[in-house]
């Protein structure tokens, strides 16, 4: 039995909940539930017995979740939620109430943080509390309350939550101050097996690590970081970060790679150099990758390479300065060119992230983004439409101007639960964006020089396996036959 049951609910096969854009990705990526397991570790550190079930990664069915609930009979059930899956997620709150009428149910995640009242209304009594923002310490307080006598009057004293009072009216307690990231324990990785998670771009098996929270950026398309983590950069002590790497390697000695999922890993020179120097000093032999801004201090790259950094996941975003400025990215095309060239010179693998759908964007500017991506020395790319999630600045703008397509949360994914284009602009329609995504991938990957470069990058059997997997996903997406320039 467990006092607290934390569920990453299943949706459909290969649905990735922990990604920035929750959906089934074309590459069928599955990401580690690092945030959830950090909260689990906080609960366990406080002495609670916790059961954790990653129904999404394990592709579990409703009956398996039901059996786990009945076996553990928790007093508190915690549900992770996403925008497209919110209605499905809430059915597991109803299931918990049906099986365990006395249990309390709590929802966490960016979607419910952005839409607490809508969530409570949809729940129709199957949800007791919505936690807004960082939930690590909030869940600990709710678990204490569940064990000592739950009441709405006591809920009023817990910061950062929303619930319905005795009159049926929504109550939103004051926001919780952002926590000290150095107080957080390492994620409770003993609840999962890293081999459940996959990404063709990473060496298998890999694990994710978050070295800080918050971001000073003002990107209008970003939802999760400003909503959940705030606008202030809070980086963990570099020695603590490398302690976590050592912990992961001791627990899972077969790991091939560590992925720093921190959105702003390269934003602080002091943090990056501290982490790299500690890795070198401790003689850790592990490849690692990270998210990277284009305005990173280029003098850091040699040290990053020496400490084992293999791949940079770079948010280039657009190929015109007008589009970058329209989404308040705070970077320039010159930053992009300099970083890509220096990374290639030093031997990094570079994955470029590009988007379509900036305010004021046209077909011509979108084609400029494709051309710009092809001009940069990169190994892999992704193209997507801007995913205007509730809680983001661009969502508010799109809603006000009538550019937003979905009229229900399920509309953020298509009929196959893959990411859907949700914007249709005056000079760039949804259909054009969909076509441009496929055209960009086709034009980038089917160039002879790109095919040759990718073949040259195959040095191990693991490299070959990842390339074959990626190629299969590429072909399954129907990209080879796509051409948006064909007459309709």
Which stretches of residues belong to each language-model region?
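Radical SAM [4Fe-4S] cluster-binding motif and immediate context
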Residues: 182, 186-351, 358, 371
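Conserved C-terminal portion of the radical SAM core fold
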Residues: 76-79, 104-106, 242, 249-261, ...
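Glycine-rich beta-alpha loop elements in corrinoid/cobalamin-binding modules
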Residues: 35, 39-177, 385-391
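Radical SAM enzyme core and accessory elements
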Residues: 2-6, 69, 75, 166, ...
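Residue-level signal for the nucleotide or nucleotide-sugar donor/cofactor binding architecture
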Residues: 60, 134, 236, 267-270, ...
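Short catalytic helix/loop segments, enriched in acidic residues and glycine
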Residues: 21-40
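Short, electropositive alpha-helical surface patch
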Residues: 60-65, 69, 273-279, 362-378
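N-terminal [4Fe-4S]-dependent radical SAM core
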Residues: 10-19, 23, 158, 163-208
């Amino acid at each position: 039995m467990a006092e607290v049951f934390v569920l990453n609910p299943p949706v459909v096969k290969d649905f990735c909940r922990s990604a920035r854009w929750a959906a089934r990705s074309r590459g069928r990526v599955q990401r580690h539930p690092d945030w959830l397991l950090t909260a689990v570790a906080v609960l366990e550190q406080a002495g609670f017995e916790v059961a954790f079930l990653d129904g999404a990664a394990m592709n579990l069915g409703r009956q398996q979740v039901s059996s786990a609930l009945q076996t553990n009979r928790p007093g508190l059930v915690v549900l992770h939620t996403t925008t497209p899956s919110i209605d499905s997620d809430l059915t597991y709150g109803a299931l918990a109430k049906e099986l365990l009428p006395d249990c309390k149910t709590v929802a966490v995640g960016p979607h419910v943080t952005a839409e607490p009242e809508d969530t409570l209304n949809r729940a129709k009594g199957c949800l007791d509390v919505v936690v807004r923002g960082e939930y690590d310490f909030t869940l600990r307080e709710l678990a204490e309350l569940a064990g000592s006598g739950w009441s709405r009057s006591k809920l009023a004293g817990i910061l950062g939550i929303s619930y319905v009072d005795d009159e049926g009216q929504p109550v939103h307690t004051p926001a919780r101050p952002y926590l000290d990231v150095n107080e957080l324990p390492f994620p409770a990785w003993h609840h999962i097996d890293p081999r459940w998670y996959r990404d063709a771009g990473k060496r298998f098996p890999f694990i994710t690590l978050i070295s800080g929270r918050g971001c000073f950026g003002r990107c209008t398309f970003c939802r999760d970081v400003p909503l959940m983590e705030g606008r202030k950069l809070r980086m963990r002590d570099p020695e603590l970060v490398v302690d976590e790497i050592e912990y992961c390697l001791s627990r899972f000695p077969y790991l091939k790679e560590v992925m720093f999922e921190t959105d702003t890993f390269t934003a602080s020179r002091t943090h990056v150099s501290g982490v790299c120097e500690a890795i070198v000093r401790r003689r850790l032999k592990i490849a690692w990758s990270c998210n990277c801004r284009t305005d990173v201090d280029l003098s850091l790259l040699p040290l990053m390479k020496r400490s084992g950094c293999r791949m940079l996941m770079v948010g280039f975003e657009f190929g015109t300065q007008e589009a970058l400025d329209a989404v308040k990215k705070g970077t320039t095309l010159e930053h992009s060119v300099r970083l890509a060239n220096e990374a290639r010179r030093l031997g990094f693998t570079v994955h470029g992230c590009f988007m379509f759908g900036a305010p004021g964007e046209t077909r011509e500017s979108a084609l400029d983004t494709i051309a710009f991506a092809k001009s940069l020395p990169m190994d892999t790319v992704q193209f997507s439409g801007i995913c205007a999630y509730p809680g983001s600045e661009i969502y508010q703008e799109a809603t006000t101007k009538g550019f937003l397509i979905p009229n229900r949360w399920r509309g953020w994914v298509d009929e196959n639960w893959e990411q859907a284009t949700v914007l249709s602009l005056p000079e760039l329609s949804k259909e054009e964006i969909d076509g441009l995504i496929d055209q960009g991938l086709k034009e980038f990957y089917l160039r002879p020089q790109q095919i040759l470069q990718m073949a040259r990058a195959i040095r191990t059997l693991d490299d070959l396996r990842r390339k074959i997997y990626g190629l299969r996903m590429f072909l399954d997406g129907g990209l080879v036959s796509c051409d948006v320039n064909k007459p309709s």
